Amino acid sequence: ALDTSNKKAIEAGISVYNRSKGKPIVNSADAAGRIEYVDLAAANDAIVIALCNGEGIAKDNDERMMYCQTLLERGMEHGMEPTDLWFDPLFLVVKGMQDKQMEVLECIKMFSDMGLNSTGGLSNNSNGMPKHIRPIMDSALVAMAMMQGLTSAIVNPNDLRPVSYTHLRAHET
């Protein structure tokens, strides 16, 4: 993923990207000050990680879905396919916000039910925890998120524990 606030750097990265590996990924847009990154992705036939927040973190799933709708409409207005927006509900720190984890998992399920792709930075979940606990927390969260339909995850490539859960699939009803 091209992860910088420098638009010229993103455009330069896209211009040399080997598309035989799939579309480049722009990380990230939101429904406020970074919404123009949706336009940038659309203009370059790229995928964009669409953060479900505005000026601040969404307070609940209604607000997350409102931001999701704004980003989806913006992308479609610029010719993007809905599958080229990967929605990030923003995994929150579990320390002190345990109740928010279930909301994020429910939001992933909502995306999945709508046929939308989802992603997220899973290590946010364990931020501030002892180093030896973080892989366990992140592994548990990725397993739960995948069961809700998580499409992809932004994980620490040096921590292979989350990868061991890639065989899980959402339960079909």
Which sequence ranges carry the predicted segments?
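Active-site-adjacent beta->alpha loops and helix N-cap segments on the catalytic face
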Residues: 6-11, 32-40, 102
